[in-house]
Amino acid sequence: MDRRIAGAPFLAAILLASLALRASGQEDSTPEMPEIFNEPMPYFTIGLGPFSRTITTDSNEAQAFFNQGIQLMYSFTLMDAARSFREAQLRDSDCAMCYFGEAWAWGPYMNGPMGVGALPRAQAAIEKALELAPDHASRIERELIDAMAVRYMGRTDRTPQLAVDTAYAEAMGRVYEANEADLDVGYLFAESLMLLEPRRGNWDIARAEIQRIHHILEEILAKDIRHPGSCHLYIHSTESTTQPNKAEACADFLGGSIPGASHINHMPSHTYNEVGRWGDGVRANQRAWHSDQAAEYGEGFAIYTSHNLHMLLFAASNDGQGAVAIQAGADYTTATGGAQYYEVLTRVRFGRFEDILAMEGDDTENPIFKAFWDFGQGYAHLRAGHVDVARGFLEAIQEGRGSAPEAAEFRGHSASDLLGIVGGILDGEILREVGRTAEAIESFERALVIEDGLRYDEPEPLNFSVRDWLGAILLEVDRPVQAEAVYRAAIEDHPFNGWSLFGLEQALRAQGKVGEAEETAKILETSWARADVWIRASRF
């Protein structure tokens, strides 16, 4: 990948020196590295933020590459971080912390375990750091190196990871106790504790372990709310709790802290989506998507591109920004080289049924993606008056649900659950269309039970909720009290989403609750300010 370099003279010379330094070799027995490590790692003068950590080195270039490496670590861009730390080693072969950084980069992190072949690389790096530390590291640096050694030394690929993670957290805890004012030490300790928790699922904010993590991160952010790594972790540690709003203040700073890191650009939306700041969620992920594209020109760091687009279309769907959501769905298809399911699902959300019918199908054999396609086609045909055709697509979904392999899943959600939801919505709408409203309500309610049973995910696999269908039909059969309850639950799940606010206003007016309805209308006006769609119900 061609990456451009510009900036101060000593940094402009970095890339030119890389090949010569590499040719001279490093005096260690580094295990075989991924092929990308044969290429020089550039120093990015476009995309990095101001964050730095001074280390023991006489080389400005080594310091610069170390700073780049730690910013990439805070951005979860681990492979490029490891490459940056190795470039720092080439500039100063006595830099103990440059080897520490590489060892850190090969380890497990919030979004994944150690990669294949990573352990011997990490061991080689930390061995070198230990060798250099007595003469080329400060006291704090030696303590960090010793703690990182606990993570890797004396173990094999068969050593239980939990035992390793526990020992590492205990070692890092001792470093933290002696250096609580050091923000990066605090980050490393908090990260080590978070690795002991399940990555997915809801976190109980009352648990002592979670409170400890929050306390450490809050202490760091009280000193410097712009610390990118700690805010990143704080968002992850609060998003699935009952108080995701605790991270709003730092989220407002995080997105621009490492301007070219798409994951950092995107991360505030994990908080914004939970608190209903959908417009901000859209902007965060648009910025991330731009960084992903800029990375092709050496001006950004791309990671999790499909996730950024998924979050973008999800936030835009809840914000009423149909054009943005649909385009993000199309970009998702291109970015993944996969099926067109989000192109279909965004069009269902925004009532673009003629567009769905004009789409050419793909040949996906994935039972979930095929069902999403069938759902969109069936729904569009139903709205076009083709009830029998819609029934045919519903039957395909139901057959697919029965025959899908038990292991079939999307983002950790089973085929049975996801097909049960979209099949339930389509079934309910078909029943409603033919006047069997009581059965339609039952179908929506069954689908809602499945939806409520899905594990925590950010974002959810579907960019809409069954509640918007259930609430709409309850209003149609003159059951506004029940509809109000449905919409209030929908707003609790997805605060300030315009679809459910619209339904709630209707339900309140139907009960004669004029004052509450007017207040809801004001909230809707603000929440729906960026919407490009006019709606008459909470679903098309």
What is each residue range found by the language model?
Residues 60-67, 94-106, 136-157, 181-201, ...:
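Amphipathic alpha-helical repeat scaffolds of TPR domains
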Residues 66, 100-101, 187, 232-233, ...:
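Alpha-solenoid helical repeat scaffolds
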Residues 72, 106, 150, 193, ...:
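Residue at a conserved register position within TPR or TPR-like alpha-solenoid repeats
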Residues 78-80, 102-138, 149-163, 196-206, ...:
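Inter-helical turn/loop elements of alpha-helical hairpins
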Residues 90-91, 176-178, 221-223, 253-260, ...:
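Solenoid-like repeat scaffolds
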Residues 103, 107, 117-134, 282-291, ...:
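TPR/TPR-like (Sel1-like) alpha-helical repeat modules
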